[in-house]
């Protein structure tokens, strides 16, 4: 079936990611065994150059779904297994398959998708997830976005930290590791923020999922979910401003696999999560996609709580985080396409 799907993509036809997401995959070792550790500060991204490089780039339509009239839907998927290196993982490309399958089954009408993975026979693959490609396609994702448009971003791979360059109050910057990070360096949270948000207009909806270590604040968004009495406590959840000066015009929400100081785990057999998939994959991606598929009317708050609870029941210590560009009304029904209702009591 894998070869059939690849042949269909090569022939310009659409891949069945729902079917692909349910295929068997090779078992893996946990991400935790292969944590990268502290990395040297990388060179900064030239954001203007990235947007120039994004001119003329295009994605492909991954499936046919009922369109959103007058609105464009773009998506960027990144999965990196670091094949043949000391940093090798096994489940990250499977995470992308699982996320694609989930969005296809939910009927998200993606007009253009870009898939950056280091798995050569991945159906619909755009290119390798090198530093240069990730940077230019981040710019592509938001380039020319207009009010009403919908954007989706998914990253599964290594996340790590580097010492801050001193331009923030934080001791460490969070960063993601491209497939060529040992040669070209990582991409820090400050640059991720600038690439995705510096030119994002109002009333654009962007959802991001980061399944990697040290990802809690990797987008440097100003508001985060908190719960009185601790992250797993039963107190009243609410949004809290944690940053000044990082305001974003668009409606952006990120779910990360863990807090900044934590690592994100892999599982050898994702069948234990009941998502329909098997083989290696990220625990956070499996829980998030399970929640999206099996609960049609979850609120933003419940989506995070249920994801955390599922991980805890299965013995994982990581605590997924929710951050946003605005103080989301956590009782609002979660949507990939609709703008936020805002909790006006949060300043």
Swiss-Prot record:
| Keywords linked to the UniProt accession | Autocatalytic cleavage, Calcium, Endosome, Hydrolase, Metal-binding, Protease, Thiol protease, Zymogen
Q: Where is the active site?
A: 158, 213
InterPro entries named in the record = Caspase-like_dom_sf (IPR029030), Metacaspase (IPR050452), Pept_C14_caspase (IPR011600)
What's one GO BP annotation on this UniProt entry?
Answer: proteolysis
Explain what switches its activity on or off, per the activity regulation comment: Activated by Ca(2+). In response to calcium binding, the 280-loop, the 280-loop, a disordered loop consisting of residues 269-275, undergoes a conformational change which stabilizes substrates in the active site. The binding to the substrate triggers the release of the N-terminal region resulting in the activation of the enzyme. Proteolytic cleavage is required for catalytic activity towards large protein substrates.
Positions of Ca(2+) binding:
173, 189-190, 220
Superkingdom of origin: Eukaryota
PTM note: After processing, the propeptide and the large and small subunits remain associated by non-covalent bonds. In vivo, the unprocessed enzyme appears to be the predominant form.
Listed under subunit, the entry gives: Monomer.
The UniProt comment on domains reads: There are 2 calcium binding sites with high and low affinity, respectively.
Name by which UniProt lists this protein: Metacaspase-2
Organism from which the protein derives = Trypanosoma brucei brucei
The gene that this protein is the product of is MCA2
């Amino acid at each position: 079936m894998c070869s059939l799907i690849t042949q269909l993509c090569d022939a310009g036809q659409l891949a069945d990611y729902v079917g692909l997401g349910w295929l068997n995959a090779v078992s893996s070792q946990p991400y935790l065994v292969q944590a990268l550790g502290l990395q040297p500060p990388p060179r900064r991204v030239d954001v203007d150059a990235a947007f120039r490089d994004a001119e003329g780039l295009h994605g492909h339509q991954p499936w046919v779904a009922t369109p959103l009239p007058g609105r464009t839907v773009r998506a960027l998927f990144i999965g990196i297994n670091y094949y043949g290196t000391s940093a090798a993982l096994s489940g990250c490309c499977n995470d992308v398959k699982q996320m694609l399958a989930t969005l296809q089954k939910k009927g998200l009408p993606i007009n253009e998708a870009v898939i950056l993975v280091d798995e050569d026979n991945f159906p619909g693959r755009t290119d390798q997830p090198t530093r240069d490609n990730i940077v230019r396609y981040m710019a592509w994702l938001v380039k020319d976005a207009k009010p009403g448009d919908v954007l989706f971003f998914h990253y599964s791979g290594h996340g790590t930290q580097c010492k801050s360059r001193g331009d923030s109050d934080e001791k460490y910057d969070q960063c993601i590791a491209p497939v060529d990070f040992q040669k070209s360096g990582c991409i820090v949270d400050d640059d991720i923020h600038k690439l995705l948000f510096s030119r994002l207009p109002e009333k654009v909806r962007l959802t991001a999922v980061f399944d990697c270590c040290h990802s809690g604040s990797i987008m440097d968004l100003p508001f985060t979910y908190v719960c009185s009495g601790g992250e797993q406590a039963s107190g009243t959840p609410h949004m809290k401003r944690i940053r000044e000066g990082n305001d974003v015009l668009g409606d952006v929400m990120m779910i990360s696999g863990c807090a900044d100081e934590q690592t994100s785990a892999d599982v050898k057999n994702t069948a234990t999560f009941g998502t329909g998939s098997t083989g290696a994959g990220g625990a956070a991606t499996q829980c998030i996609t399970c929640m999206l598929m099996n609960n049609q009317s979850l609120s933003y708050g419940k989506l995070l709580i249920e994801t955390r609870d599922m991980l805890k029941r299965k013995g994982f210590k990581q605590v997924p985080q929710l951050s946003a560009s605005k103080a989301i009304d956590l009782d609002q029904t979660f949507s990939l396409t609709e703008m936020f209702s805002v909790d006006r009591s949060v300043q």
